[in-house]
């Protein structure tokens, strides 16, 4: 099984939004990443549009029409603005392949926890059904908790995205091995229930290979902050290729 790399472009938009010049270009960044071999593009449009804006989502969807073998993943809280943003693309028959539901509060600094079951089940079930009616795959942002995977499966999710910040924070410490073991156990629980496994948050060139090697069945990693930071030094193409090598190392 090959683990796919989806590049999150939020930080490109964040830099662009500090001026009114349109640079750096989000669509240019996407093009360079796709040309370098990235398997997909991820964005997380927040209600305050502090980085990715609704226009960016449309422009990227238009761009993705030229890359039919790659995927467009849109993250966000379906209780806020996500469903409206996605519906706008669906109405125009623009490509979007996966929605990742994230339980962020409005104005939250960054994603920092997953959905809770059974507490969130009644709110999520109709939203997942709506996304499925639009022909989209649904992934739920989840903490590494094997017992919670049954809840994700019960509400109709297709995949879970494991929130990897606890692993990243433990990297290089005595907690690294226990964290990897917990993520591996969670992935096995998800796979046993027929869920696909994605992962993301603070994965980087240092910790990615070990994660891929230890955690079974990871279909996709979504990486933004570290990858864009590396691209400031190395360029988009070299950076994407470096991350693809990390994935290949983890799979070897």
UniProtKB/Swiss-Prot annotation:
Predominant location = cytoplasm
The entry's localization annotation reads: Cytoplasm
- Known NCBIfam families for this protein? pdxJ, PRK05265.1-4
The record's InterPro entries line, in alphabetical order, gives: Aldolase_TIM, PyrdxlP_synth_PdxJ, Pyridoxine-5'_phos_synth
Instruction: Please provide, in alphabetical order, the Gene Ontology terms of the cellular component aspect for this entry.
Output: cytosol
Its biological purpose is as follows: Catalyzes the complicated ring closure reaction between the two acyclic compounds 1-deoxy-D-xylulose-5-phosphate (DXP) and 3-amino-2-oxopropyl phosphate (1-amino-acetone-3-phosphate or AAP) to form pyridoxine 5'-phosphate (PNP) and inorganic phosphate.
Q: What is this protein called?
A: Pyridoxine 5'-phosphate synthase
**Protein's pathway:** Cofactor biosynthesis; pyridoxine 5'-phosphate biosynthesis; pyridoxine 5'-phosphate from D-erythrose 4-phosphate: step 5/5
Q: Which gene encodes it?
A: pdxJ
Q: Where is this site: Transition state stabilizer?
A: 161
Catalysed reactions listed for this entry: 3-amino-2-oxopropyl phosphate + 1-deoxy-D-xylulose 5-phosphate = pyridoxine 5'-phosphate + phosphate + 2 H2O + H(+)
Known partners and oligomeric status: Homooctamer; tetramer of dimers.
Alphabetized GO MF terms = pyridoxine 5'-phosphate synthase activity
- Binding of 3-amino-2-oxopropyl phosphate occurs at 8, 19, 202, 224-225
Biological process terms from the Gene Ontology for this record are:
pyridoxine biosynthetic process
- The Enzyme Commission number assigned here is 2.6.99.2
What is annotated as the active site? 44, 75, 201
Q: Is-annotated flag, keyword Zinc?
A: no
Q: Which keywords does UniProt give here?
A: Cytoplasm, Pyridoxine biosynthesis, Transferase
